């Protein structure tokens, strides 16, 4: 009888340990987001509300200045992985968010902290300017 309880207790311990490891792995994955994530109307709210610092790049495929800053956004995402989450929102495919935040010029970067707007940056600015505007919120 005691042996059966020991076996059952060990199974429970192993299951709990596995659950804790999964949660830990999930946290590590989130901390190491090192490239811009695709954001849609459906995922926007959850994305901006669930991170301490999020930068959403509002862009369109036909926009030349948007394509010019895309590599800068990629670099910043790598350099600030674990500190800042970068997202890309295609304004042509996600009109609800575009209208809600009155995106009339692109590229526009919106900086959020847990869903609250901290800054709105419009135009294809050089990396040092973008970096300074974003990192002041760290």
Show the residue positions of the predicted features.
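Proteins that catalyze or organize thiol-disulfide redox chemistry
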Residues: 1-55, 61, 71-79, 83, ...
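Structural microenvironment flanking redox-active thiols in thiol-disulfide oxidoreductases
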Residues: 89-99
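Structural micro-motif
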Residues: 53, 102-110
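Short coil/turn motifs that cap or connect alpha-helices
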Residues: 92, 104-107, 116
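Hydrophobic heptad-repeat coiled-coil signature
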Residues: 63-66
């Amino acid at each position: 009888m005691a042996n059966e309880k020991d076996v059952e207790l060990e199974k429970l311990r192993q299951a709990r340990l596995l659950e804790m490891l999964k949660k830990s792995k999930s946290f590590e994955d989130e901390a190491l987001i090192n490239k811009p994530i695709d954001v849609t109307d459906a995922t926007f709210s959850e994305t901006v509300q669930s991170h301490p610092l999020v930068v959403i790049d509002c862009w369109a495929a036909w926009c030349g200045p948007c394509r010019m800053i895309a590599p800068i956004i990629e670099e910043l995402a790598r350099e600030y992985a674990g500190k800042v989450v970068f997202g890309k929102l295609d304004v042509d495919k996600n009109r609800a968010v575009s209208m809600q935040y009155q995106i009339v010029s692109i590229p526009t970067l919106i900086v959020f902290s847990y869903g609250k707007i901290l800054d709105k940056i419009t135009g294809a600015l050089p990396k040092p300017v973008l970096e300074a505007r974003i990192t002041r919120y760290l």
